[in-house]
C-alpha cells in the first residue's frame, strides 16, 4: 500500500490555515535595509509630524523614469508647496526581483486648526543605524565574470568574516550569508594566490547570476551583533530608457501623485507614498522639527559658506564645501513660495559637476550662522528656565514658538521672504517674562550702572543727555544705534543693553545723578590707586568702594541673585552668582525698550519715580566691589566701617582698584546674556546675526572653573591651555601647543580619559570630538586646518555615543557631527 493511500485512512485532516501575505510573513532586517539605503537616509518616526514636498516626489519620479515633468501636466493651484502631515505608518520593503529597498509611508495632512494645536517636537527621525563591522565594494568586471571569484580586501575580510584557520593549506571555510529577503547564500572563503588574497569562490557565480549583478553594482557584507553574516545589494543607477508596458508612464505617475496629494489636502484624508532612497535625489518627507530648525532658526545670506554631506563609494560620508550664490524659488511658476531647493550654490572642488546646483536648507550646514535653537550639548548653563514660566516644551503651551499670537494661523501665515526668521517663525516669550515693576528695574539698573567704573556705560549716559526726540525719529535712528552698539559689544566681548533701553527706563534727572556719582567714584579710585603698594595689607575706606545692592529687601535680593549681606565678606563669589545679579525681570524689562511702538508711553508714574530715587539712595549707601564677575562685600564690617583685604603681587590684583580696569570685561561678567525682545512680533528690530538672538533664551555655556578668564587669558596669543570636558569625568586642562596635528591630540585625549583608540575612528566607535571657538560656534574637531584650530579653540567636548544619541532625541541631527 502506498503511503498516499495509507494517509487517507482515518479521520479527515483539517485544512491548513491560509498562508499569510508576504508583508506579514517576513519582517525585513532594519539594519540591513538602512545599510542598503545608504548612510544618509533617515526615516521619520511613526506618529510624528512631517513636511511632505510634492515637488520632491516629482523629482523621484523624474529620476526613476529619466523624464522631467512636461508642461502639459495639469497644475493643482490648491496644492501647497509643502504639506504638514501626520505620519501614521512607515514600512520598509525590498523589491523581490532587484532587491532595491524602498519605504511606504501613510500620511494625513493637518488642517489649520490642528497645525495650531500644541505639539511637542519629537526626534529628527529614525537615525540610519549603520553597522560597525561591514564593508562595501563596487564590483569590477572580474568580480562578475562566471569563471572568477570575488576578491575581498584583506582588512575587510579580517574585520567582517570569521577568522580563517591558517594551519590548513590553503586556509578556507564556508560562509553562510542572508540577504534582505532572509534567503541563505553559501560561499567558499579561501586565502590563496600570488600574492595571497581573500577570495569567495564556490557559490559566488551562482549569486551573481541569480541577482543579475553587473560591473558597477555594489555588495555589502555585514557582521551583526548576533554573529550573523548579512548580504546586501546596491545597484548602480541606470535610468530605464524603455519602460515596460505594465508600468505607468511618467506623465501618469506625475499626475497620479499630484492628484492624490491635492485630494488629501482638500479632504484631510490619508494617502500613501513610496520613497526610494537610492533613486530619489533628496528626501521629500522631512521631520517637522528638522524643517522648522532649518527654515526659521538658521539665517543664511548670499555669499555664506556652507558644507554638505554626500555618500562615497565605500558607503561612508564626506563633506563638500560650497558658497551660497542665490536664494530663490527653484520653480516659481509651478511651485511658488517653496523651500524645496531654494538655495542655489557653487561648489569648491573640480568635481562640482556631480553635485546638485540647488539644495534645500535642511541639507546644508552653514559655517557662519547664529542659531536660535537649543544648544546641541547638554552642558551646564548659567541661567536655568525660571519657575512659573512656560518653557518651549511646556505641557500647556507646548512648542509655542510654532504658533502665532491671537489671529495668526501658524503655517498658514507664512511669508516667503527669504530663508531665516519670518514673521511667523519668530520666537515668543511668555508674558510673565515681560512683567517687571519699574521700581525694581530702576533699582537694578542703578546698581549695575554704579558698578561700572566708567567707559562704556558712561559714554552711553553722556549720549543720552541729548534732548529726547520724537518716536518717529527714534524709529529711524534705532537700527543705526543698535548696529553701533552691537559692533562695540562684539569688539569688547560684551553683551550690553543698548542706549534705547536706558533712555526709556531712566529719567533725565536720574541719569545726571548717576553721572555725577560715577565721576566721584572714579576720582576716589584714582586716589586709592596712588596709595596702594604691593606686599602690604590695605584697609579700604567706605568711601572708596563701589555701591552694591546689599541693602535691598530680602525678596528682591533673592529675585535678582544678590548675595546675603550676612555672608563672609572676605570671599569671592563665583561667576555664576555674579551673573545672576541681573535676573530675568531686569533683562526682560530692558528688552522692552526694543519695541519702539511703546516709546511714546510714559516710562513711570510720579510715584514710581520717587520710589526709584529712594532705591538709588539705598544702593549708593551700600558697599561692595565688583571685579570681573566676582563681588567682594564689606558686610559685616569692622567698627570703623572698613574691611581688610590682602592684595598680592599678582598683576590682576594690583589692577583691581585701577580706574583703567577694562569696563567691557566687568560688564561681560556682571551682566549675563541679554534676552531679546521677541514678543509682539518685534524681532525685526534686532539686526540679524545678533548675539542677542544667539544666547537669549538658552543662556550660555558656563566656565566650570568658576570664574571667567581675564582678558589676558582669553588672548589667543598668550593662552595655550584649553579645557577638555567629558560627561561623567572631571574636566582637564591641556596645552595644545604640545601637539603638531589632530592625530597626536586624539591619542592624548584617549589616554587622558581612558578611551584609547575610541577617538581615532569616530564613524566606527561612535565617539565624537567637537570644540567651541572664541565666537561661541560649535565645530567638528578636524575640519579646520591645525593652525586655525589652535588659534580659535576655546574648549573641547568629548561626546560619547550616548551623548550623540541624546542629542538626536532632542531634535538635532547627529549625522552633522559625525
Curated annotation (Swiss-Prot):
Positions of disulphide bridges: none
Give GO terms: molecular function aspect only.
Answer: DNA binding
Here the segments flagged for biased composition (Polar residues) are 629-640
Alphabetical GO CC annotations of the entry are: nucleus
What ranges does the record give for the region Disordered, renumbered to this chain?
A: 1-24, 526-565, 629-648
Pfam families assigned:
ARF_AD (PF06507), AUX_IAA (PF02309), B3 (PF02362)
Q: Where is the PB1 domain?
A: 719-803
* Entry's transmembrane regions: none
Which keywords does this chain's UniProt record carry?
Auxin signaling pathway, DNA-binding, Nucleus, Transcription, Transcription regulation
InterPro entries linked to this entry: ARF_dom, ARF_plant, AUX/IAA_dom, B3_DNA-bd, DNA-bd_pseudobarrel_sf, PB1-like
Source organism's superkingdom? Eukaryota
Biological processes per GO annotation? auxin-activated signaling pathway; regulation of DNA-templated transcription
Protein role: Auxin response factors (ARFs) are transcriptional factors that bind specifically to the DNA sequence 5'-TGTCTC-3' found in the auxin-responsive promoter elements (AuxREs).
Domain statement: Interactions between auxin response factors (ARFs) and Aux/IAA proteins occur through their C-terminal dimerization domains III and IV.
User: What is this protein's name?
Assistant: Auxin response factor 12
